[in-house]
Every structure is written in structure tokens, then in C-alpha cells.
Amino acid sequence: MASNHKSSAPRPISRGGIGLTGRPPSGIRPPSGNVRVATAMPPTTARPGSRGGPLGTGGVLSSQIKVADRPVTQQGLSGMKTGMKGPQRQILDKSYYLGLLRSKISELTTEINKLQKEIEMYNQENSVYLSYEKRAETLAVEIKDFQGQLADYNMLVDKLNTNTEMEEVMSDYNMLKAQNDRETQSMDVIFTERQAKEKQIRSVEEEVEQEKQAADGIIKNMSPEKQVKYIEMKTTNEKLLQELDTLQQQLDSLNMKKESLETEIAHSQVKQEAVLLYEKLYELESHRDQMIAEDKSMGSPMEERERLLKQVKEDNQEIASMERQLTDIKEKINQFSEEIRQLDMDLEEHQGEMNQKYKELKKREENMDAFIETFEETKNQELERKAQIEASIITLLEHCSRNINRMKQISSITNQELKMMQDDLSFKSTEMQKSQTTARNLTSDSQRLQLDLQKMELLESKMTEEQQSLKNKIKQMTADLETYSDLAALKSSAEEKKKKLHQERTVLSTHRNAFKKIMEKLTSDYDTLKRQLQDNETHAQLTNLERKWQHLEQNNFVMKEFIATKSQESDYQPVIKNVMKQIAEYNKTIMDALHNASRS
């Protein structure tokens, strides 16, 4: 069919009247209005303007028209209507856009191929880079091995230079090997311990997480009032912890300040005495305040008697309440024993929360047993306390009776005598205040005079030392004057000393020349030995071994530092303490919650 017959190449430029293998433009009408070009001709008949037949006669257009491709539809060919007629008209039909699309597709294909080549080149470069990197790593390992061998050779050269025997070298080697083996074993032990501790920490963290989940479950199962109370207690706990941190910081700062003050006081005798006096003053003031408070708290004998009777009644009520609590506790023990038996029966069926409740009840039972065991002792203590209180009541009653008799005697005193006694008391109090101020003034004067005395003693010691030094100088100058007064003896001794020094100079010059010759000979021998040693391969190996030994020493030091840092990193004691503290807090919170739940 005509719709399946497409031209793969662009259409040639055609002219009217020229017998080319192209079809006429689709926009040209046929010469006759009665004749219509068939759109669905059989394959045997050729269409006008197609490859199968000659070009139709038409001289409608005298100019060339460029057509990209022939439009093909299901019903054959259809021309495009143009907006204007005339020469050089371009038809932008479907074939034009298809050709344009093909050109763009070819450009995109070339660009994609170009990018694909660049990607392949990049991948090749990347693979080469990876191979180079691997090769560099292997070469670095080889260099490290060679450095180790070089250090060994340097150490060997050093041993040869120092004329070390082979047995000593082997003993050093064995010692280093044993030390390295021990350090390797210790590192392995530390590593295994660290793994075990990390595993233990993970298990503890899991247990803590489980306890947290259990606590969250208990909190969720609480009533809203208890949840609100729990949240309030939690916030209060956080606030108290913050206050504890701040108070701890303040305590640390005060302790540091105290230590600095103590060190400052330790170097000063006057400050130590002042501290002792302040402590004594503080004790006296506290004793005075205590006596004043006791005097104020002491009432009349009747009030004391009533207070003691009230205290006896309160103690009796407390003993009765304790007995009632004891009976209640016994009833609770029986009840809990029944619950424990029931829990023992249901323990195999119900695990988890029931097991936890069983443990709590078991613990509560142990606490109650301990209370019952210590009840007799506490009871005896309370009875002894009661007897002591009764004895004190009796003594106070006797004291009250004596005071009453004394008050009766005092009541017989006249107002004039009482006024005289009050005046005497005020006079004595003023005298006491004056004596206290005098004592304070005398204390300050004593301290000031002690300071002056210390200064005077210091000056006296300095003057004594200076006087002694001046006496020594006078003695030395007197001896020098006696020596320098005899000039003839000084000249003769100087001449003798000069002759002796000349003789020593000549002897030392001869020795110097001899030693110079010996030194030149030794220097030449040293140079020859040095050249021989430099040419010797063993010396070169020993030098290399010495360098390798230094490298090993450096590596050993680095490994020791690494082991020390890892040991510090693997210190798990603070973590364990923190975890155990949190576990104890969570357990306490859960116990309190369960206790409140059981009460409610």
C-alpha cells in the first residue's frame, strides 16, 4: 500500500517539465479539475510523481522548492496549504519536521557516543588509579618491612662496632623477643577483656532498657493521679539533682579555698594563733548562746512537770501504736504467706510480672521477718527509755519541789533588798563587759607586741651575723697587712715562683710537642681506620642496623603510648558505676510504684 511505502532519503529538487525521479510538489493542483489523483492505487500502476512512473507534465512553478521528505498518510498523499504563492516557497509539512527530528537525533547520538567514550576513559583512569593505589599500599608495606630490616642491620653494626659478643647479641634478641611476646600476650588479654567488658556493658544496657520498658509499662498502667504524682516527683528529683550538682561545685570550691587558706596559715605563726583564738571565741559564744537558750527554754516548775507528763503520755501512745502496728504486720505476714503459697502454685504458669511480684513479696517477707526478729530488742530499748524518762521525771519533780521551796524563801525578801540585788547585778554585768573589752584590748596589744618582738629578734640576729662577718674581715685584713709589710720576702717568693713556672713551661712545651706528634700519628691511624671502616660492608650493615634499631625503639614507644591510650579508653569502671546507680534508681522507683499500687 501507499501508506507503507516510505522514502528513506531526502526528496530531490524537481522542476516542472523535467523528467526526474521525483514527485511533483504536493501543493500543486492537477491540470484538470475533473481528474483526481488516486490515493489507493494498486501496486502495478504507478502514481504520478512517484518512483514507479514518469514525472507528470506540469509547469506550474518555475523555481526550485526544497522538500524535506514526502508526507505519507493512510489515504495516500495530501498537499499542505501554503499561505502565499510564488517562487521560493518552502513547505513545512510532516516530512520536514521528521527530517529535522532525525538530524537532532543523530546529533544526540553522536553526543551520547562522545559522552560514553569519556565515561569509558574515566573508568579506565579510575581503574588505573585504584591499581596504583593498591600498588602504593603494597609498596608502603614493603618500605616498612625494609625499614625494620634496616633498623636491625643498624643495630647489628652498632654491636660490631662496640665489639659485642654473639652471645650477648643472642641474649638481647631473646630478651626482646620474650618482651615482645609478653606485650603481645598482654595486648591480647587486654583486647579480650575489652571485648568481654563491652559485651557485659551491652548486656547491662539491654537489662537497663528492659527495666526502663518495664517501668514505662508500670507507669502507663498507673492511674492518672499517680502518673501526675510520678511526673511531679520526677521533676522534683531532677531539680534536686541539679541543686546537688551546684552544691557539690560550691563544696569543691570551698574545699579548695579551705586548703589554700590552711597552706597560707601553716606558714604564719601569727595566723595560727589568731585561728586558735577565733576557735576559742566561737566555742565560748556557742556555749553562751546555749546557756541563754536553756535559760529561756526553762519555764516554771509546773510547766516542766506538765511537759514531762505530756512526754510520758506521748511515749505511751507511741508504744501502743507500735503494738498495733505489730499486730497489723503479723496479719499482713499471714496474708502474704497465703499469697506466696498461691504464687508458688501459679509460678510455672505465669512468668514475667507475676515472677517480679513474687520477688517483691519475698523481699517484703524478709523485711518483715527481720522486723519481727528485732522487735523484742526494740521493745526492750523502748522500755529502758521509758524507765529513764520516769527516773528523769522523778528527779525533775524533786527539783521542782526544791525550786518551790526556794521561791517561798525568795518571796520573803523585801522589795528594797530585791532592788539592791538588781543594782548589784547590773553593776556586775557592766563590770563584766568592761573586763571583756579590756581583755580584748589586751589580746590585741599582746599580738601587736609579739609581732614587734619578732621583728626585733630578727633585727638582732641580722646585726649579730653582720658583726661576726665584720670581725672575720678585720682578721683577714690584719693577716694581709702582716704579709704585705715584708716586701723583700714577697719579692724573693715571687722570683722563686717565676723560676718554677719557667721550668714547668719548658717541661710542658716538650710534652706538648711529643703529644702533638702522637696525636698526628693517631689522627692518621684514625683516618685510615675510618676509610677502611667506611669501605667495609659489615660497617654499612651495622650502621643500617643501628638506624633500624632506633626505628624499632620509636615504634615501641608509639605502641606503648597506644596501649596506654587504649587502656584508658577501655576503663569501664565509671560506666559500670553509672549503670548500677541508674539500675538502683529504677528499681527503687518501681518498688515505690508497686508499693503505692498495693496500698491503693
From Swiss-Prot:
Tissue: Predominantly expressed in testis, but also detected in other organs containing cilia-bearing cells, including lung, brain and kidney (at protein level).
Compositional bias segments (type: Gly residues): 50-59
Disulfide cysteine pairs (residue numbers): none
Coiled-coil regions listed in the entry: 97-390
Annotated spans, Basic region: 1-90
Biological process annotations from GO: cilium assembly; determination of left/right symmetry; epidermis development; heart development; intraciliary anterograde transport; intraciliary transport; intraciliary transport involved in cilium assembly; keratinocyte development
Low complexity bias: start-end ranges: 22-33
GO MF: beta-tubulin binding; chromatin binding
GO CC annotations on file: acrosomal vesicle; centrosome; cilium; intraciliary transport particle B; motile cilium; nucleus
Subunit structure: Component of the IFT complex B, at least composed of IFT20, IFT22, IFT25, IFT27, IFT46, IFT52, TRAF3IP1/IFT54, IFT57, IFT74, IFT80, IFT81, and IFT88. Interacts with IFT81; the interaction is direct: within the IFT complex B, IFT74 and IFT81 mediate the transport of tubulin within the cilium. Interacts (via basic region) with beta-tubulin (via acidic region); interaction is direct. Interacts with ARL13B and IFT88. Interacts (via the IFT74/IFT81 heterodimer) with RABL2B. Interacts with IFT57 and IFT70B.
Alphabetical list of PANTHER family matching this protein: INTRAFLAGELLAR TRANSPORT PROTEIN 74 HOMOLOG
Protein name per its UniProtKB record: Intraflagellar transport protein 74 homolog
Gene designation: Ift74
